[in-house]
Every structure is written in structure tokens, then in C-alpha cells.
Amino acid sequence: MSFDVLAMVLAGGMGERLMPLTSVRSKPAVPFGGSYRIIDFTLSNCINSGLRHIYVLTQYKSHSLSRHLRAGWDFLPKRLDQFIDEIPAQMQLGDRWYKGTADAIRQNWTLIEQSPARRVLILSGDHIYKMDYRRMRSFHDGKDAALTVSAIRVPRSEASQFGVLQVDEDNRIIGFQEKPEDPAPIPGTDECLASMGIYVFNREKLGQYLGDGMDDFGRNVIPAMVSAGERVFAFDFTTQNQISENEWIQRDGVRIKRVVERATDSTYWRDVGTLDAYWAASLDLVAAAPSINLYGELWPIYNCPQHFPPAKFVHEEANRTGVAINSIVSDGVIISGAKIRRSILGPGTHVHSYSYIENSVLMGGEQSEEMLLETSIGRGCLIRNAIIDRNVRLSPGTYIGVDRGNDEARGLKVIPIQGTNEHLVVVPKGMEL
């Protein structure tokens, strides 16, 4: 698959619903899972799928993402014509930014023209999932398709957030609704087939449908191709994606390794475009048997190496023991006589004595050429149901996520957690409380 497919990763989104996390960075650059950025999942899928011609199209507040790509993803040998290249917005068609997903491709059409690839794989850089794009390419070729759209089954109650596909018995798309109020279900079920924003195009057909006014794949290009009778198909991610992984089992008293052909995270996909979705997907990772496995051997998720010392837990008095339960603790973290439960601590976080953190995501500190900035949680702090961005400093005795009125009075973003009486609190980057 290496050279017959060109990957174009759309990574310029503003991520307005993720504010304030995206006030200083684009959505694909938001830290996730302790040591990762959101875009690392899409790029890892590309590498694991054998793709070696990859463009990353950036636009909105791209400095953080650009730095991450240079530091962590500039490893393919260009002398062998392999690359992951960042392409900033060029304004090729006038003095304007991208007007939509398809317009981003149109403004970079020269890159596609210069490529020998006959298929173009268009990806979003802001979803959390594992996917073998080779299986989708094989499906596309087997159907002699002009376009294949990867789709996932979602409850009908949630389908209005997505583009919804209607397909025939051969998975050919016969109808498309972009974020409909009354989504059409899969016949006989209470589920809908939702577009994942992942497309395989035949290059020639893609060029035919990128004319003026064709700015967005969901709103313009896909409906136009379906209406024109083009061969447009849906790849059912829920049933057809396959990620193999090793697992250890006991057999006759001996621990042995075997390959599971379709691991459980083959069906995992999350759009983390809202704060509550980001928080929930983050906490998926801390389960004993997580929905998506960051520790797999056969489908690794790569990240940017960071030069922090190992994590450290100190103090052992009965009421002052440094401990983390059902949590992810990154390098450079010091838990100094504090208790952490069901949380993620990013690199460079220091939690001082007698503090308690639960159901929270702390992105940690930040390394620069000049200094190391840490996130510091003072003594006796209580943090529940929170997202705390980088380089935050909390004074001793600070409570977050306990009193909604108090959180709002301090100017923090507060949103309800669906199905509960609790609330999620977001502390922006660099804040001191």
C-alpha cells in the first residue's frame, strides 16, 4: 500500500467546542492519554498500515502541532521517497483560509497531481481509533468504487451529530444526510450508519468533484456523487475493521503468547470534538481492560519522545501515602503523599501531600528550549471531574469540581455531565488559582 495511496490528513480544525483547550492550539494538537497528541492516532494508523506518502494539512494555531510533527514524526527516510510533510495553508485560490474539508484538498491539488498514487486517502487528524486502512483500500478496489466512505454504527439518538448514510444490500450508498434532525436508521435496527470522515477516492473522480462551491465532502461532494450515480460505497468499520494483537494466556500451567486476529479495540472510534467526549474518551484508557489498548505490540501508537525522568511516588505515612489507582501516570510525575484515582497525569505534574484527584485529566507540564514548566497541585487540594491544561498551578487547599458556583465564580468553564447531577470543570493553560 506504501506508494499507490497518498494520505492527506486534515489537521487545521479550530475545535471551537473544545475551548479553552483549543485557545492556544489546533484540535489535533490537544494532548491526550498522558504522552500523546490526538493526531498521533491517525498518524500511527498510517504508519502501521504501510503508508509512506503522508501530507498533514495545517491551518489554525498550528505552532504547537508543527513543533510536535517536527520533534516526533520526522523519521521517514526522504532519500527513499518516504515522508510525513506538514503543509501550512497556502491560500492557493485567493486571500482566504479553507472553507471546508473539500476546499482544503482543492487548495492543495498540486500535491496530488505531483504524486504517482492513483488513490487518495483523506483522513481527519482529530479522532481516537485504530484502523487498518489497507482493508478499506481492498474493499474499495473490490467494489471498483469511485469513492469509499468509512462508516460506523451509532445509536440513532446520537446520529444527528454525523453525516448519515443509507446503503443497499451491497453497501452501495444510495442516500446521504448531513447531520439530519431525523436520521434514517439501518433497516430493522435502532442504529444509523455514520460517516467517520475517512474517504478513499480514485484520484480522477476526486478531481472531477472539486469545482467551485464544492467546499465540503459531507455537504457537497458525497451528495453530488451519489446523485450522479457514481459508484460510492460504505466500508462498515464496525464489522470490517480488523486490528490483530498479542495476548497472554495460561495453558497447562504455562504462560504463552498468542495472536488475536480481531482485538476488541477494532471497533473503537471516538470523535473527541467536545469537552465531555474528550474527558470520557480519556477515562476509557484507565480501565483494567480498556476499550482501546495503548500497550499493544502489533499496532503501536507512536508519540513524540519527551526527556522527562521516571515517575516517582513518595511518602508512606498512613494518611500521606503517594498512590495512584486505576490511573495513567506519565514520566516526570511526582506524587508526593497524594492519592490519585481513575485519572491521567501528563508529564511534568507534581501533586503535593494530602491532595486527592479523581476522574480527572491533568495534561502536565511543558518542556521548551529554555525551561521546564510543570503543573503543580498544592497541598490539600481536591480535584474531581476536571480537565486541567498544561502549566497550571493550584494553591494549597484549592477545590476544583466540588462547588459549581465556586468554579463558575473563578471564571472556569463548567458543563453538566450527562446522566448525572455532577459537572465537568476545565482549567485553561497557564492558570494560577
Language model region names:
Residues 1-74, 80-82, 92-95, 111, ...:
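N-terminal glycine-rich phosphate-binding loop and ensuing alpha1 helix
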Residues 1-6, 204, 212-433:
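Left-handed beta-helix
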Residues 81-105:
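Active-site-proximal specificity loops/subdomain of glycosyltransferases
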Residues 112-117:
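Glycine-rich phosphate-binding loop signature in dinucleotide/nucleotide-binding domains
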Residues 120:
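Short aromatic/hydrophobic "clamp" motif used to bind/position activated sugar donors
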Residues 123-125:
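Active-site acidic Asp-centered loop
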Residues 127-130, 393:
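A short, conserved beta-strand element in the Rossmann-like catalytic core
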Residues 130-204, 208-213, 227-230:
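Conserved core of the sugar-phosphate nucleotidyltransferase
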